[in-house]
Amino acid sequence: KDCSVWDDKGQEYLDLYGGHAVISIGHCHPHYVEALARQAAELGFYSNSVVNMLQRRLAERLGKACGYEDYQLFLINSGAEANENAMKLASFKTGRTRVLSAVKAFHGRTSLAVEATDNAKIIAPVNANGHVTYLPLNDLAAWEAELAKGDVCACIIECIQGVGGIRMATEEFAQGLQAACKRHGAVLVCDEIQCGYGRSGRFFAHQWLGIRPDLITVAKGIANGFPMGAVLISPDFKPEYGQLGTTFGGNHMACAAALAVLDVM
């Protein structure tokens, strides 16, 4: 409950972990519990072939809360899925296949997301496809040199690295990288999965750095533990019917959870 957890012997602990930065409004928040129970009693799931008004409400509410009202919202089930779809969109938009990621980055454990993660132990041979180049965070010259080659579809960064050791991008680097991406036709992706949703004192960590990325990925705190991920998509991306898809993403229960989180925040 709230910031406390108990073990099987009744010992209470102050939870400073939050389930790996997931519990954004506390355990068993009464408004959250009530919202999920109410939604489960009404409709737990239906296909995305039918318009889900909860998705529209969430897109509007989240856009206003984070300052990206003009961005589109694509909903999925996890952070890895969010990053997969962000990099997929970048490749569609640019027609390119190469990604720049930071040394010590963590972006997920699937397909291209794991290839963009700087940890050889979790990259299976089938995932090592040579699409990703790792560069030191805050070494702007190194990123500019790679972008100048003209084959990069996306630069993906955590503005505050989590697994990488709470290392923050500098304002000079972030703004310079954004300018270089625009200059060379690449897409800037900010992975806000762990550092976003108010965790840094602003809604997104990149908002301390004076940049406005093309794509923003979120998960973890978005639904307080209910599986959900999302990509906020710049209006520069023209929607194409059927380009992205998901069975469970943005389901009624997940949307109810995410809306309850925004209510409390």
Name every feature range the model reports, one short phrase each.
Residues 1-265:
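Conserved N-terminal phosphate-binding loop of PLP-dependent enzymes in the Aspartate aminotransferase
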